[in-house]
Amino acid sequence: MGPLVVTAVLARVDERGRRTLSRKLPKAIRADLDDSKRLLSHTDVALGEAWARELSAVPVSSPAQLFEQLSLEGLGKLKKPCESHVAGQCWNDQGEAFQAEAATLARVTKHRTALAERGVQLLSVRSSVVCTKQLNHAKGQGTNRFVSDLNAMEALVLELRAQAGADVEAVCGKVGGIAEYSKFFGPLSGRLHAILGEGRARSGYRFPGLGDGWVRLDGPAGSTAVHVPSAAVVTVAAGAN
């Protein structure tokens, strides 16, 4: 298996936005904002690129610049475990170029505006990458891939909580069929929290100074969402390449 990639999106959501998110989005938006496994492939990532470019803080001129801007860890930290003679296998960007056409970019911008008009203001995006070497090292230490996935989600939630500047509400897709998530917390371990409920359908936790976290079976597959009450929502999705 390739690296684990976990992505989080921060949005400001009011009561109207909560109603928007509680039902199906308009068909035109769903055509471009849905399960990535349905909309994208390894040979066609243009739509994902368009959303990433739309949500980047400043315009970028290359995929490498876009990755650096959106990366939670930053390229320097990600390259650190690499031995020099194999680094090029992961980090060679020669020949890389943007794929999204102007029409796709314009359509995504229109979707973002439409969501804002419905009370869902998309603010920013961050991605965390856990490479195969790190996954193997974690496995050797007794941490399986599902827990590495959960821990990456936690780190992204903390990052976007800092960006939001207010308590958040996190909603995550179930990870590995776990019910008692507090046993496997990494970045959140040691933090005071109350258990709001733990079960097959969903598990919930409240963290003073951070907000509420829900892990739900009915959340998007392999994903996490974080909401700041009347302020922001973070959605985190995981996938392997």
Language-model features and meaning:
Residues M1-N241:
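RNase H-like, Mg2+-dependent phosphodiesterase core
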